[in-house]
């Protein structure tokens, strides 16, 4: 696993993109094209995975393609490259397909924000120089999975090849926005809104409930073991959602919705369906007082865990988030 790093130098590519965004905000170049055709529907990410696979040379396939059941497929870390071949090592057309796959597995609302986060956290390397991909199985002929990794990024596209598994397997996302050691307000962090919502639940709890929800130290980060599912309905960290009032439960649902918001609708819908199958009441919500930034009682580290799901949000020193959801056993 590569050590965490951060660069505060804005590369030319990022600068140009930010400049174009600023220009758009000022109305520059915003004149509509009369008679422009309606934008064609974009191909599904799974279709693009096959297109990308078909474009690979035999040499490239040897470097980045593996059997579907290869142990590397379900590996997860906070900062790693799944193969040695970087995105920038592919042809420009292939790079464009990879980016389109990445954008396609995220929601329209968040896709650009998430891409910008990965670009930023990759420093001078950018998305192309800081990311790598692998394909497991053979797209178009059976089970397959496309995996893209980098700093603060493990994303999957499997076309539902992994039945009963949300997002094709465990996910990781994160962001070091303003600095490696973020301040309590996590200025500019793409995912801090999720913690804000979670802390709203804490504020709704009464004294006894807060006592149950507040814990010492969290599970910490241990690669794939971080998202190991226990199958337990009781004895987990924090307060059981089944012990909450109706309005408190409703806010937990909002937390879950926020956790799913960055991802495309069909994947988020499947994930929430699996969470409900395990029983909302069986989920436990925990906040970790020994890992907080500042003394504001806005908890930076928290989690939701049930028998068939875990969403671990580690907001210190910056945001790392781990998610794994499966069909209940």
Language-model region placement:
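Detector for intrinsically disordered, low-structure N-terminal pre-sequences
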Residues: 8-9, 20, 33
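A cross-kingdom marker for long, charged
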Residues: 39-58, 62-329
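N-terminal secretory signal peptides
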Residues: 1-14
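N-terminal export leaders
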Residues: 12-28
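Short, polar/charged, Gly/Pro-enriched helix-capping and turn/loop motifs at alpha-helix termini
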Residues: 22, 29-30, 112, 266
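Bacterial Sec-dependent signal peptides at the C-terminal "C-region" and cleavage site
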Residues: 30-39
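Low-complexity, intrinsically disordered short peptide segments enriched in small/polar/basic residues
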Residues: 5-7, 28-31
């Amino acid at each position: 696993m590569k050590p965490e790093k951060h660069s505060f130098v804005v590369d030319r590519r990022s600068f140009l993109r930010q400049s174009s965004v600023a220009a758009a905000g000022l109305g520059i170049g915003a004149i509509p094209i009369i008679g422009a055709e309606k934008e064609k529907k974009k191909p599904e990410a799974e279709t693009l995975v096959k297109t990308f696979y078909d474009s690979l040379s035999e040499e490239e396939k040897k470097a980045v393609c593996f059997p579907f059941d290869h142990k590397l497929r379900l590996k997860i870390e906070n900062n790693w490259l799944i193969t040695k071949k970087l995105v920038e090592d592919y042809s420009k057309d292939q790079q464009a397909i990879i980016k389109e796959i990445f954008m396609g597995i995220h929601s329209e609302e968040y896709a650009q924000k998430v891409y910008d986060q990965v670009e930023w956290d990759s420093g001078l390397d950018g998305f192309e120089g800081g990311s790598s991909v692998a394909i497991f199985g053979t797209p178009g002929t059976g089970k397959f999975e496309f995996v893209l990794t980098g700093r603060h990024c493990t994303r999957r596209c499997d076309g539902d090849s992994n039945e009963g598994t949300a997002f094709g397997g465990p996910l990781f996302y994160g962001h070091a926005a303003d600095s490696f050691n973020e301040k309590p307000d996590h200025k500019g962090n793409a995912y801090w809104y999720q913690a804000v919502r979670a802390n709203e639940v804490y504020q709704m709890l009464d004294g006894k409930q807060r006592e149950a929800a507040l814990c010492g130290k969290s599970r910490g980060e241990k690669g794939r073991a971080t998202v190991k599912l226990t199958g337990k309905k009781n004895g987990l960290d924090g307060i059981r959602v089944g012990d909450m009032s109706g309005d408190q439960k409703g806010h937990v649902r909002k937390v879950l919705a926020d956790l799913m918001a960055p991802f495309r609708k069909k994947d988020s819908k499947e994930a929430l369906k699996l969470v409900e199958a395990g029983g909302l009441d069986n989920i436990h919500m925990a906040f970790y007082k020994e890992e907080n930034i500042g003394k504001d009682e806005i908890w930076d580290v928290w989690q939701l865990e049930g028998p068939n799901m875990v969403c671990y949000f580690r907001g210190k020193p910056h945001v790392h988030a781990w998610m794994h959801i499966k069909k209940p056993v």
